[in-house]
């Protein structure tokens, strides 16, 4: 799969507020030229969008993407928790923190088995 990374724009096209319909058509034609490996029409000067190289741009793009994904995941989970019944959960920990109850462990460890002959002192002796 071939990917197209646009790293240059025609001079004067860097500001979106200046774009009008004709400029968008020209930019589209320029994109078609670069996409089909043709040469740009004469009179169009291309200037780089940034002084960074392609590896640096890809690296920054990846870090930005990951940061956005993490932020949206965190915000989404917070919104989900605040709008769900899970936020009204009244388990033992929440009751303890509110001073309503106390945490108890219902599991009881079985007693350790008694060692045979431990009290008579014969353990480990041979007869």
UniProtKB/Swiss-Prot annotation:
Q: Which UniProt keywords apply?
A: Cell membrane, Membrane, Receptor, Transmembrane, Transmembrane helix
| A GO term for molecular function | endothelin receptor activity
Q: Provide GO CC annotations from the record.
A: membrane; plasma membrane
Q: In which tissues is it expressed?
A: Widely expressed with higher levels in kidney and aorta.
- What effect does gene inactivation have here? Embryonic lethal at 12.5 dpc. Mice exhibit impaired angiogenesis and dysregulated neuroepithelial development.
Q: Which gene encodes it?
A: Fbxw7-as1
The molecule here is called: Dual endothelin-1/VEGF signal peptide receptor
Q: Where in the cell is it found?
A: Cell membrane
Residue intervals passing through the bilayer: 66-84
Which residues are exposed on the Cytoplasmic face of the membrane? 85-127
Q: Which domain of life is it from?
A: Eukaryota
The question of whether Transmembrane helix is a record keyword is answered with yes
Q: Which organism is it from?
A: Mus musculus
Q: Which residues lie on this side of the membrane: Extracellular?
A: 1-65
The role this protein plays is: Dual receptor for both endothelin-1 and the signal sequence of vascular endothelial growth factor A. Does not act as a receptor for angiotensin-2. Does not bind the VEGFA mature protein. May play a role in angiogenesis with a significant role in cardiovascular and neural development.
Topology of the protein relative to the lipid bilayer: Single-pass membrane protein
Task: List the GO biological process terms.
Answer: blood vessel development; hippocampus development; learning or memory; regulation of autophagy
């Amino acid at each position: 799969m071939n990917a197209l990374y646009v790293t240059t724009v025609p001079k004067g096209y860097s500001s979106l507020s200046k774009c009008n319909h004709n400029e968008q058509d020209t930019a589209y034609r320029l994109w078609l030229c670069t996409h089909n490996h043709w040469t740009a029409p004469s009179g169009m000067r291309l200037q780089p969008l940034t002084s960074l190289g392609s590896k640096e741009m890809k690296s920054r793009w990846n870090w930005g993407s990951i940061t956005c994904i993490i932020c949206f995941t965190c915000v989404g989970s917070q919104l989900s928790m605040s709008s769900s019944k899970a936020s009204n959960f009244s388990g033992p920990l929440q009751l303890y923190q509110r001073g309503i109850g106390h945490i108890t462990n219902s599991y009881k460890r079985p007693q350790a088995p008694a060692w045979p002959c431990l009290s008579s002192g014969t353990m480990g002796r041979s007869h």
